[in-house]
Amino acid sequence: MLSSKALLAGNGAEDCGGFIARYRTMPTQALSLKTAARLDVEPASDLGLITVLLQNKGDNRALRAELDLVLSNSAGRMSSLRMREIMDGGQPLYVAIFDYKMGEDLTFALTVNVSGEPPRSFKFVERLN
């Protein structure tokens, strides 16, 4: 079984009002074979993974949502990524796979729609090595 804590170790976080969005990006080659199989990911040197966990500020429970993610590379090429929901220990975790070149700056623009909350958008830049 996956562990959200393990996938989000060294993560970034964004305060989104009533909830916190915790995220992490990593090369798929950094995944254990067991985790890669669970995520249905074939590790490759040019594939990255993003994970997003949404936690209610009041009780830390994981929240379900609709997520829209747009990735821009250093050349300005934009692509919309499909975020898949997987259940991890009874909690929803959102994942997507993306292409990248080692050492390239990638801008992730994420919009999160949690029921009962206004949509929240934020950006962050990562470089995978």
What is each residue range found by the language model?
Residues D59-D68:
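Short flexible loop/turn segments that cap and initiate beta-strands
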Residues A9-L49:
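Beta-strand-rich domain onsets/edges
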Residues L49-K57, V95-I97:
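Short edge beta-strand/loop segments characteristic of extracellular beta-sandwich folds
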Residues F98-K101, F108-R120:
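Short, exposed beta-strand-loop hairpins at the edges of beta-sheets
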Residues D88-V95:
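Aromatic sugar-binding surface patches on proteins
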Residues D68-R82:
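Short amphipathic beta-strand segments in non-cytosolic proteins
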Residues P118-L128:
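Edge beta-strands of extracellular beta-sandwich domains
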